[in-house]
């Protein structure tokens, strides 16, 4: 079947997770900063890219460079700084969030803060399809929360328990699987059953 990570909504969320794990991941940065839209336009991102390339910085590092003010208007810099602080705050909180209940609360708040459900419904003409995509998001977040709580379903569907993990540790596993899947390794397609075994 279709890889779980090939679904656009899961790729969107994985971009955010990858950015928490590695802020130098430029493709993840670009997807997260534009999905859902945050008022940071193509021109701003293009100028940021030129600046980052010139100084050999990742896009995220470039956000906080002192000399960025000479390359971008103040309004654009303010929006970029706001995004950067938001990502840093999420990473810090994910590092300190353990257990299924706290992880579920964190993920629910995060999806609300970025307006992801509204984004899905606004970008999808078919409401049933939008609802199905939102259900995929909820299933993915529930799985992450269970992993934080130490619950793992093996491939036979038997629930096993292990030690609790921080949300950032779970994000690291997902980030790795997502990156491998994005590289298009045909014989190693990541499916939901692979996720359950991870």
Which residues does each PLM region occupy?
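Conserved helicase C-terminal RecA-like lobe
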Residues: 7, 14-198
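Conserved RecA-like ASCE P-loop NTPase motor core of nucleic-acid helicases/translocases
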Residues: 1-4, 13
